[in-house]
């Protein structure tokens, strides 16, 4: 290690490599005596753990052999591609070291979140020192052989990623994309009263939008019910190539900012290891005492006022303990330490010599015996069993998840005597069922919404709970509750992040959002799906409860809000992910929505996206019919078909997916039955979009033979779809009759208008569907030309009516499904 610039780093050994300029190796240091809570022995022990973790971290980045430096480093000992990020690692290892101290002293149940997740070598090193790595990966024992394997696998083909990942013991936070650490930490703490989450936030990460809003997470943490989060802002001043904003504003301004977010920040700063150890130990003690005081007061019946939670601002150098100077450029304490401080260690003799000196500066001979095992004094520093942060079962939430108690959805269904004979708001019906789900599961189920719970018609949930709210309550506020089971905040990032943290630590939840604005969390969905994908391949990870979206206020019923609110493209984003992970459902009415959501809340390790309407909509299927239809995922609606010669191939297939497309398809089918009674029409409704894929492409996919039986091999298919038309083509391009498939859907035509004008703008309306049938069924262009002209005229009249009256024409607005005369 280096003494840092103030300690005379330039007195270290110099090496001049082929790259030119001086390269300065770090040297071992003596611990400075400083005031603090640590006695000499404890200070030395903590520093030994920190040195060991740093040594193991550097080894992971550079070495593929000779882990204990039993011989001078040679080129073949160095990896040919040096990948990783050392800059943040010493800070992560430092926090882990001191977290272990308070865990042991206080018997804490704690987990660790590495916001600068690209510092993956640090948590890997600590998990190996704690023994968890070897317990989970028997081929990586806690000795020299295991150390060599730990080093060799890092950022290496067939190995482990450079950042915290599902493969990392003790991690439930993916470290690839920055910004979500604090939200995951708060989500983990919800309903976990005994849990402490040590959350390290990178100062670069703190510049991201999601992290910037994450500080408000403490407004939803009830100290009487929930655990605690200790945010630690790692202020090492630099990102990849630039300084960080938080490091370059005056400290009083930073403190005022953090206090404004509801924290009591404690600053720990320095570049002398002995001094920093003492300061950080003192800060940890203060924070743990304050957290215990807050929780004790709340659980003893205090007035419930929102506390100011403690946090730590840790200001230490970027790449602390790495070579101070490389090829004449300052590295330690600068942006140059972000990734690999010695980039030419394999090919440059000077870099390689300095790498060896760097590794030896940690004095590994004091830390590991001659067989590479951590010395007993080091092992004694780790907590025991599940108290080890790398072994805490909370970080493997699938091992803790329990089935929800779910009421029978059939008891909440609506009566359907005849198809289309009644109307209901589908999501309002679902809200009644979710009310009971909430009541039956008061400790492991939460609903999240960005101020849209009532707008999406789920307000019945508030009959049994309130909105979680720890801030001030005004005279006219309603349904706010310190222990509420609904979290509403106008930030999709907060909703998604808290829910992810809640799910990753073994619980269940629902996120309801306007369809167009769920795009705000596209990237968060993407990262969570990747976590599910990767964790499914890790044998010791257990399946999590699914991430369940309920998207409403959707594209076809945002006619009043206009173009900005009209976007069904989240479905396209979701279906880019692996079929083993994602599911998309488009229930056409209230009963199918109930059946679908019952299935989703029972499922494991998926992302379920359900799109449903909140406006009054026709009820098509009874409870019994809905159960069968949803189990199939798609099927022929015989009552809507028309074929005077049963057993013959239909002349045309009308397919639909989504509530509004279903309505328009059935209206088109009624017109065809009335006006072209000899035309054989088959109506197919699709609830589970994955059924359109081939069986070999998705677990829900239909075999080709079944698909051809339903959709035929030659008849035209007119498919009315909720989203962008090309998505259906993506799903069906390998099917026999794909050339006969014509899809209508949203084609980015929108404005503030009426519901029917919206579908007309996108050629999804009943009249245009009839025109599509006439255009594509052989012979109809000639024989049904008059009907086609009527459809053109009907569209014109409908649009003219909206321009004159500001509402849809009654023949459309008052339409109901006609009972067949036969």
Swiss-Prot record:
GO terms for biological process: carbohydrate metabolic process. PANTHER family: PHOSPHOKETOLASE-RELATED. Its cofactor is thiamine diphosphate. It is an enzyme of class 4 (lyase). HAMAP family: Phosphoketolase. Coiled coil: none annotated. One of its GO terms (molecular function) is magnesium ion binding. Keywords: Lyase, Thiamine pyrophosphate. The keyword Lyase applies. It comes from Nocardia farcinica (strain IFM 10152). Belongs to the XFP family. This is Probable phosphoketolase. It comes from the Bacteria. Its EC number is 4.1.2.-. InterPro entries: Phosphoketolase (IPR023962), THDP-binding (IPR029061), Transketo_C/PFOR_II (IPR009014), Xul5P/Fru6P_PKetolase (IPR005593), Xul5P/Fru6P_PKetolase_C (IPR018969), Xul5P/Fru6P_PKetolase_CS (IPR019790), Xul5P/Fru6P_PKetolase_N (IPR018970), Xul5P/Fru6P_PKetolase_ThDP_BS (IPR019789). The lineage of its organism: Bacteria, Bacillati, Actinomycetota, Actinomycetes, Mycobacteriales. Pfam families: XFP (PF03894), XFP_C (PF09363), XFP_N (PF09364).
């Amino acid at each position: 290690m280096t003494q840092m610039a103030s300690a005379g780093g330039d007195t270290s050994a110099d090496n001049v490599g082929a790259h030119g300029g001086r390269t300065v190796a770090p040297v071992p240091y003596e611990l400075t005596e400083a005031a603090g809570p640590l006695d000499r022995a404890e200070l030395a022990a903590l520093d030994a753990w920190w040195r060991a973790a740093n040594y193991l971290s550097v080894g992971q980045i550079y070495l593929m052999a000779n882990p204990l430096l039993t011989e001078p480093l040679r080129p073949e000992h160095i990896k040919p591609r040096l990948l990783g990020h050392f800059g943040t690692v010493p800070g992560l290892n430092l926090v882990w070291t001191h977290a272990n101290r308070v865990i042991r002293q206080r018997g804490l149940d704690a987990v660790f979140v590495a916001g600068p997740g690209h510092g993956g070598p640090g948590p890997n090193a600590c998990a190996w020192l704690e023994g968890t790595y070897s317990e989970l990966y028997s081929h990586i024992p806690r000795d020299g052989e295991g150390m060599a394997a730990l080093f060799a696998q890092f950022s290496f083909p067939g190995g482990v990623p450079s950042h915290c990942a599902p493969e990392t013991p003790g991690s439930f936070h993916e470290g690839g994309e920055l910004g979500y650490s604090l939200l995951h930490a708060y989500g983990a703490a919800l309903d976990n009263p005994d849990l402490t989450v040590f959350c390290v936030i990178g100062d670069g990460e703190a510049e991201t939008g999601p992290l910037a809003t994450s500080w408000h997470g403490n407004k939803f943490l009830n100290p009487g019910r929930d655990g605690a989060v200790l945010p630690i802002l790692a202020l090492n001043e630099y990102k990849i190539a630039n300084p960080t904003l938080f490091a370059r504003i005056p400290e009083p301004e930073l403190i005022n900012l953090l206090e404004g977010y509801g924290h009591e920040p404690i600053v720990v700063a320095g570049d002398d290891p002995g001094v920093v150890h003492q300061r950080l130990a003192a800060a940890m003690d203060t924070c743990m005492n304050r957290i215990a005081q807050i929780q004790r007061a709340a659980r003893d019946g205090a007035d419930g006022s929102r506390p100011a939670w403690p946090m730590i601002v840790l200001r230490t150098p970027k790449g602390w303990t790495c070579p101070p100077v490389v090829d004449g450029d300052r590295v330690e304490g600068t942006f140059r330490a972000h990734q690999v401080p010695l980039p030419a260690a394999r090919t440059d003799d000077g870099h390689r010599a300095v790498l060896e000196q760097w590794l030896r500066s940690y004095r590994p001979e004091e830390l590991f015996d001659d067989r590479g095992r951590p010395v007993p004094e080091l092992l004694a520093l780790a907590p025991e069993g599940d108290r080890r942060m790398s072994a805490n079962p909370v970080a493997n939430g699938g091992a803790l998840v329990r089935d929800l108690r779910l009421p029978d959805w059939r008891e909440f269904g609506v009566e359907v005597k005849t198809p289309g004979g009644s109307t209901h708001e589908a999501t309002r019906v679902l809200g009644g069922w979710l009310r009971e789900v909430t009541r039956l599961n008061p400790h492991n189920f939460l609903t999240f919404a960005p101020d849209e719970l009532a707008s999406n018609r789920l307000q019945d949930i508030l009959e049994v709970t309130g909105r979680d709210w720890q801030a001030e309550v005004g005279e006219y506020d309603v349904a706010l509750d310190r222990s509420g089971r609904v979290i509403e905040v106008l930030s999709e990032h907060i909703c998604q992040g808290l829910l992810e943290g809640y799910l990753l630590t073994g619980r269940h939840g629902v996120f309801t959002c306007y369809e167009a604005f769920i795009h705000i969390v596209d990237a968060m969905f993407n990262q969570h799906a990747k976590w599910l994908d990767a964790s499914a391949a890790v044998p010791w990870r257990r399946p999590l409860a699914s991430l369940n979206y309920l998207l409403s206020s959707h594209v076809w019923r945002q006619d009043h809000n206009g173009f900005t609110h009209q976007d069904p493209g989240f479905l396209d984003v979701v279906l880019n992910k692996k079929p083993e992970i994602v599911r998309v459902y488009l229930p056409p009415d209230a009963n199918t929505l109930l059946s679908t959501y019952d299935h989703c809340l029972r499922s494991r390790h998926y992302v379920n996206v359900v799109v449903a309407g909140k406006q009054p909509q026709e009820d098509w299927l009874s409870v019994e019919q809905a159960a069968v239809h949803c189990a199939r995922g798609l099927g022929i609606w015989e009552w809507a078909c028309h074929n005077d010669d049963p057993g013959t191939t239909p002349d045309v297939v009308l397919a639909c997916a989504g509530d509004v497309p279903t309505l328009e398809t059935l209206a088109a089918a009624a017109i065809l039955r009335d006006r072209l009674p000899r035309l054989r029409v088959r109506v197919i409704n699709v609830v589970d979009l994955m059924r359109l894929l081939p069986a070999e492409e998705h677990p829900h996919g239909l075999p080709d033979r079944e698909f051809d039986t339903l959709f035929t091999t030659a008849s035209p298919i007119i498919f009315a779809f909720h989203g962008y038309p090309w998505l259906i083509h993506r799903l069906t391009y390998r099917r026999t009759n794909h050339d006969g498939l014509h899809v209508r859907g949203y084609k980015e035509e929108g404005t503030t208008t009426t519901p029917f004008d919206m579908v007309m703008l996108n050629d999804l309306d009943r009249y245009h569907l009839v025109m599509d049938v006439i255009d594509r069924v052989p012979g109809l262009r000639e024989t049904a030309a008059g009907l086609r002209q009527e459809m053109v005229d009907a569209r014109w009249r409908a649009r003219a009516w909206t321009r004159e009256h500001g509402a849809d024409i009654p023949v459309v607005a008052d339409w109901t499904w006609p009972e067949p005369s036969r």
